[in-house]
Amino acid sequence: PEHMVKSYYDLGQMAGLNVVALDYIGNAMLQLIKTQTNQNTTTMVIQLGSESTVLNIVQGDNLLLQRTVPYGTNSVVNVVMDDKGVDATTAMTLLQNDRLITVDFDDNEVTGAFRYLINNIGRVMDFYASKNPDKPIEDVFLTGDGALIRGIDGLFKVQLNVSTRIMDTLYNIKFDPSIDLKVYNPVYLVTPIGAAFDPMGFALADAGTQTTKSEGSIAPFVALVAIAAIGAAGMAFYSINKKNTVTEICRQDI
C-alpha cells in the first residue's frame, strides 16, 4: 500500500538517509543467501528475530521453501529478565556473553523457552522432507538477532539433528575497514546487504514510475531501507531516542 511505502521513505528521511530502494525481508535474505551456499547442497537459513523467525531452504539459486514461524527470541529474553531482574537489553547481553542455555530443553527454564520455536521449525522441516525426499536438508545457518546467543548453534544442532553454524562471516562480501564487525556483526546485516543485490523496487507514485519485480500481494512484510553505501549498512545507526520516535510513527502508520 502507498501509505506503507511512504512511511519507510519518511523513516529514511528522518534518519538522515538517502533511500535508494525498498525491499521485503524474504526477497532480501534470498538474494544474499544464494551467494553464501554451496550449489549442490540443500541449506536452511534461519533468521532469528525477536517476535518471529524466517526460514529459507535453498539449493544453489533455487528457493525450495520459505516460511515464517510466529516465535522468536522474546520468550527466552523474558525468562532471563524475570530470573535476573534486568531489562531486555541486559538480558540479551547476558544471553550472548554467558552460557545460559544448554542443548536440552529440560536442563533449565532458559533453554526450555526455545522449545516452541525449535519444535515449529522441526515441523516445517518435516513438511519440506515429505515434499522433497530427494533433497534432504544438509546444513543450517543461523542469522538475525538471536544468532549471537551463546551456545545456540549447539542447541539447534542437537534438537534439529543437522549440522548448524552461525552466519557471522560472509563470503565475497568486503566491509569497509572503519566498520567494527564486533559491533556490526554480519548476522545483523544479511537483509540490508541482500536488498542491495536485487530489491523488489517498491516506489512512491509521486517519485517516478512505480515498478516492482513482480505483481502480487505485498502482504504484511518487514520492509528495509537499502542505502547508497550499502556496504557500510551497519554504520547508519542513529540515536536511540530518534529511533524510538521514528519507530512509533511507523507503527501508527501501519
Model-derived segments and spans:
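Positively charged, low-complexity intrinsically disordered regions
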Residues: 211, 252-253
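Hydrophobic/aromatic-enriched cytosolic interaction surfaces used to assemble or bind macromolecules
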Residues: 1-242
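Ser/Thr/Pro/Gly-rich low-complexity linker/stalk segments immediately outside membranes or between
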Residues: 241-252
